[in-house]
Amino acid sequence: MRALRVSQALVRSFSSTARNRFENRVAEKQKLFQEDNGLPVHLKGGATDNILYRVTMTLCLGGTLYSLYCLGWASFPHKK
């Protein structure tokens, strides 16, 4: 029974400290993402979102091209 009380106290202390350490900025983010400025939602976060979007698209395109290359290479017979 004592172990149960100790574990509950530990969980309570860990979960409450993390929650109180950061300020709530949901209203700021909602205001940023809901304003009508013509940008797509995945680019409204700024330069970091733009870079992340471009890197993701480059990796997707590269992976698609590489998979097509591997399919083409595997479809032809190889000399032995």
Swiss-Prot record:
GO terms for molecular function: oxidoreductase activity. It is a single-pass membrane protein. The chain crosses the membrane at residues 47-75. GO terms for cellular component: mitochondrial inner membrane; mitochondrion; respiratory chain complex; respiratory chain complex IV. Residues 1-21 form a transit peptide. InterPro entries: COX7a (IPR039297), Cyt_c_oxidase_su7a_sf (IPR036539), Cytc_oxidase_su7a_met (IPR003177). Keywords: Membrane, Mitochondrion, Mitochondrion inner membrane, Oxidoreductase, Transit peptide, Transmembrane, Transmembrane helix. Pathway: Energy metabolism; oxidative phosphorylation. Residues 76-80 are mitochondrial intermembrane. Residues 22-46 are mitochondrial matrix. It is found in: Mitochondrion inner membrane. SUPFAM superfamilies: Mitochondrial cytochrome c oxidase subunit VIIa. One of its GO terms (biological process) is mitochondrial electron transport, cytochrome c to oxygen. Belongs to the cytochrome c oxidase VIIa family. Component of the mitochondrial respiratory complex IV (CIV, also named cytochrome c oxidase complex), the last enzyme in the mitochondrial electron transport chain which drives oxidative phosphorylation. The CIV complex is the component of the respiratory chain that catalyzes the reduction of oxygen to water. Acts as an assembly factor that specifically drives the homodimerization of CIV complexes, mediating the formation of mitochondrial respiratory supercomplexes (respirasomes) containing two CIV: supercomplxes with two molecules of CIV show improved activity. PANTHER family: CYTOCHROME C OXIDASE POLYPEPTIDE 7A, CYTOCHROME C OXIDASE SUBUNIT 7A1, MITOCHONDRIAL. Component of the complex IV (CIV, cytochrome c oxidase), a multisubunit enzyme composed of 14 subunits. The complex is composed of a catalytic core of 3 subunits MT-CO1, MT-CO2 and MT-CO3, encoded in the mitochondrial DNA, and 11 supernumerary subunits COX4I1 (or COX4I2), COX5A, COX5B, COX6A2 (or COX6A1), COX6B1 (or COX6B2), COX6C, COX7A1 (or COX7A2), COX7B, COX7C, COX8B and NDUFA4, which are encoded in the nuclear genome. This is Cytochrome c oxidase subunit 7A1, mitochondrial.
